[in-house]
Amino acid sequence: MRSNGCGDLREQNIDQQVQLCGWVDRRRDHGGVIFIDLRDRSGTVQITVDPDLGADAFTVAEHLRSETVLQVEGKVRARPGESLNDKLATGAVEVLASGITVLNSVKGNLPFPVSVHDEENTREELRLRHRYLDLRRKRMNDNLRLRAQTIQAARRFLEDAGFIEVETPVLTRSTPEGARDYLLPSRVCGGEWFALPQSPQLFKQLLMVGGIERYYQMARCFRDEDLRADRQPEFTQLDIEMSFMDQEQILELNESLICAIWKTVKGIELPRPFPRITWHDAMEHYGTDRPDTRYGMELTNVSDIVKDMGFKVFSGAVKAGGAVKCIAVPGGNDAVSNVRIKPGGDVFSEAQKAGAGGLAFIRVRDGGEIDTIGAIKDNLSDEQRQELLSRTGAEPGTLLLFGAGDTATVNKALDRVRQYLAKELGMVKADRDNDQWNFLWVVDFPMFEFNGDENRYEALHHPFCAPNAEDLGGDASKWSETLPGARAQAYDLVLNGLELGGGSLRIHDSTLQRQVLQTVGLTLEEAQEQFGFLMDALDVGAPPHGGLAFGVDRMVMLLAGEESIRDTIAFPKTQQARCLMTSAPGGVADKQLEELHVASTWVEPDQED
């Protein structure tokens, strides 16, 4: 049906007879000669239709609409000098049509134009509703190809390294892993339920017990959680697990994997080794465990300097066990006005969204003089002022922004303000123009965090992470005391402020695993009920093992320079977890529910009393 791709034609094809198939991208009538931009997945080429050289083809071309599907026969020739188009890969040639066959026409009006010239002007809701049409756009086509290239590069590397791809079950049982499960009622086993996997975590550990040693999978995962631009209810993760490797070996192997992917997809040699930072230092200096290190403005703790100030906002926060931290914004005096920092201003609002009551500020002038509100200036001694300037490295023109309160809120607020100002002040490029790849390993996470509302410990990652042996100690009788304060042998890979993947060494001893499950609030009976199969497996000679999982959708989003993972998935859901194209989720017949032994209690909001 076709001999060449539209985007493959070059000067070496001149004088060749070709058959092309594709869609009409644009049609232009230049007074007697019609030009058609014909598009397929390989690109676009100009078709010239001259009535003197192809009367039948011209008759067809007169009535063509955008997105009509064509087969074109003709001869490749050089474009005249005045019509050369260096913006097109095929811009040096055109095809003189001798025949045009309409393979399918467009019925009715298109919901939106597909041409690259119009693709920025369509609402996302409309694009998702007609995704099959949206996929014809070059940008979407390129993203899906980049996704395939990324997955192929990962598979090639892992298989060369001795890993084998193993599929794990999609229908499994519900276990407490953090997010809500998607549940499926069993028709055969009435009253019992399957859950879709949030990850293959336990199955990949069981594969290690089974002697597989090196496993990977492009795993489909499902989480019923609140969505945002870089989350979907169903997603793909590159899941990796390996036996008889320590943390250092796992990190080195996965660095090599990432470098291989970036080399294949972007043609970039990434510098190695990737920097590392402990979780504690990340929280102290960036306010987050996902630091963006492309720019400065690190958080500086100044609690000891201001703890005795007469300015009660600062001293009161320290006395209450909180902290006072600040970020130094270079050039901030000119770039950030007082109006923006005060209530109602955009910078103030960013801090407020993170729970802060406000922001204090100091403007550094020539000679180390400062401008600020009177309550700070009147209560800041020369010694304190000098110490602040010295510790923050603030030069004239610098704006110091302060957060005061409980440490968690201060960290969260200043992290948000830091990221916001970096974009506002041009410290980072727009996603599509990004050429900085700042990878960072975050290590030494706490095993647990305390949930004050429920008065219990929760696993910071999951309850299968191995604790640091030094923190745990060798006396099993004291594990209940040492575990809550222990560090996990866990690690996250962060790229430009986004978590790209994470993993850990796993517990391979059933006694320790039971103790960890007890620490997060499970009784021994509950642990056996929910995880008895895992404990049984650990008791038959489980090897030391560990692994990591990368978010494929997020990785492709970063490689493609997109702002949302929805633009890297063929058929994504909205932030309300809906598919606008198929209208999923949807209702089902009562008979189907009866077969599943399920009854719906849902009441439409306008029908409630």
From Swiss-Prot:
The record marks H30 as: Important for tRNA non-discrimination. SUPFAM superfamilies: Class II aaRS and biotin synthetases (SSF55681), GAD domain-like (SSF55261), Nucleic acid-binding proteins (SSF50249). CDD domains: AspRS_core, EcAspRS_like_N. ATP binds at R223, D224, E225, Q232, E499, G551, V552, D553, R554. Residues 201-204 are annotated as: Aspartate. Keywords: Aminoacyl-tRNA synthetase, ATP-binding, Cytoplasm, Ligase, Nucleotide-binding, Protein biosynthesis. It holds the Pfam family tRNA_anti-codon. Belongs to the class-II aminoacyl-tRNA synthetase family. Type 1 subfamily. This is Aspartate--tRNA(Asp/Asn) ligase. It comes from Synechococcus sp. (strain CC9605). The lineage of its organism: Bacteria, Bacillati, Cyanobacteriota, Cyanophyceae, Synechococcales.
